[in-house]
Amino acid sequence: MVGDRWTLLIIRELLIRGGCRYTDLRAGLPGIATNLLSDRMRELESAGLIRREDAPPPVATTLYHLTDMGTELLPVLDAIGRWGVRYMVEPANGDAFRGHWFAFPARFFLRDRNPDGPPVSIELRAADSPAVIEITGGVLSTRLGTADQPDLVLAGEPRLILALFAGAFTAAKAAELGLEFSGDRSVLDRVLARPAAAP
């Protein structure tokens, strides 16, 4: 069942986003048919990988969550993500990308190399909605939305941001290909595996 089409992508959505409505899941899985998503959700619930609960009032909806057993699939998704990153940095016609998907690459490739430094934030403007990476005391977290006063803003194609994070491109190369940098570029040197060589 875990190897069935879309199953691991559903697990990924719930790992990144936490409790989700059915409509949130569908929006995060471009291309999935409604009936197939319903079937997969039933199978995952029967297998004990997800659970449902009512949202607190006044919202009348159901939220889906991973169970502990479902969360145990995180290393599987990590391994697949690390293996597949080489394909994420190449342009591909028709590929869709969602802002919250930056959470996995950020976990793979970014580290706070100055945990005693001040909190910083990087706003990512790509895909359907902006995302923010917040770095505080050695911990990186990713969320949807904007930052009030981001230290750095990266704006452009998702693949360019992914390539920069993965070390496939320097900042100069990413800028040459269209990635825009606004703010303190030295923030990249704090989180990237190798110096970014600012454009």
Describe each PLM feature range:
Residues 1-32, 47:
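N-terminal helix-turn-helix DNA-binding core of bacterial DNA-binding proteins
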Residues 45, 54-57:
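CheY-like receiver
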Residues 69-132, 185-199:
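Acidic, aliphatic-rich amphipathic alpha-helical segments
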Residues 147-199:
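C-terminal interaction segments
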